[in-house]
Amino acid sequence: MEPERGRDSIMHIEQVSPARADVRDLIRLSDEHLAKLYPPESNHLESSDDLSRLNVLMLGAFNDGTLVGIGAVKILVEDVAYGEIKRVFVTPEFRGQGISKLIMAELERRLTENQIGISRLETGIAQPEAIGLYKGLGYVERSPFGAYQPDPLSMFMEKKISVL
C-alpha cells in the first residue's frame, strides 16, 4: 500500500510474518487487552503459530519504520469462500489516527485480489470503538459462522466486498 502521511510521519502497510518479534509483541499486547475485557471462553484468539498458516495473510502498519498496528485475514471455504478478519490491533498511542481503517482497507483489497467477495469477523461487545469501525466500514451483524457458537459477549459481522 502506498505510504500515507500521518501526523508528521510516513505510514505504510506491508505483509509481515507473525514470527517477527515486533509482531509477537503486538499480539501479546492485544491478548493482554482482551483478557481484561472477556473471560477465556469468550476470547477467540489466533496464536502466532495459527497466523503463520498458509491460508492467513498478516499485515503490519508502520510509522517511520516502527510497527504500530497489525491485522490478519484467514481464507476459509465453507458454504462459500470468505475471509475472516483477525487480530486488528493498534498500539494505544497511535489510536484515533485511522490506522485500523488503513489496515482493514488493505485486508479487503487483498481479499478482492484473491476473488474472495465476503469478509467476516467476530468482535466483542465491550469494544465499542471496534464495533463502530466495522459498522462504519459497512459490516452488518450476522449469525455465528464457522466453528463459532453463540456467545452473549460476541458480535458476528459480515461485509460483501467487490471482487475485481
Mark where each language-model region is.
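Short glycine-rich hinge loops at helix-strand junctions in the catalytic core
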Residues: G98, Q115, G138
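Active-site acidic-Proline motif in GNAT/NAT acetyltransferases
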Residues: T91-E93, Q97, I125
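Conserved GNAT acetyl-CoA-binding A-motif
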Residues: M104, L111-T123
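Terminal substrate-recognition subdomain of acyl/acetyltransferases
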Residues: E2-G6, M155-L164
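Acetyl-CoA-dependent GNAT
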Residues: M11-K86, T91-E93, M104-E106, R110, ...
